[in-house]
């Protein structure tokens, strides 16, 4: 009797593929507000200050590691702990910067690039394309756009930055290849 129950799968509504691929409720509905500061215009440029959050509701350590911008001026910020944030209010005044967590759990993201409105992230183990399928401001699907076959646990083995060329190719810098070590990325 017990054996037959173990072999018969139960039907669950959550097993429906369409249900699983249409997004879901917000996981991080909170936003964080900071204030930026305009820099003095000297010569050809000014250095503005974008203040990062002092703390978050998730108590994560906020160490910025990547930055890019949407065409509408919103900023995308990655942090070393695995988060991707979207920052609104990056304008001429910088009076109200609104930080919204877009994705979490990425493996040491060190580069981010917005292409055609989609966010791509360079992680230690892959290039990830983030999808917000229900347009609620959070990534619902993390697509492995390109997996890295040379992943090291070495602390200094990072995949830095993320750039594209006019043909749509992606480029990043991979450290740790100038040694004689048998450990990849060491």
Task: Name each model feature, range by range.
Residues 33-186:
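Beta-propeller blade termini and top-face loops
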Residues 1-28:
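Extended acidic/polar, glycine-enriched regions
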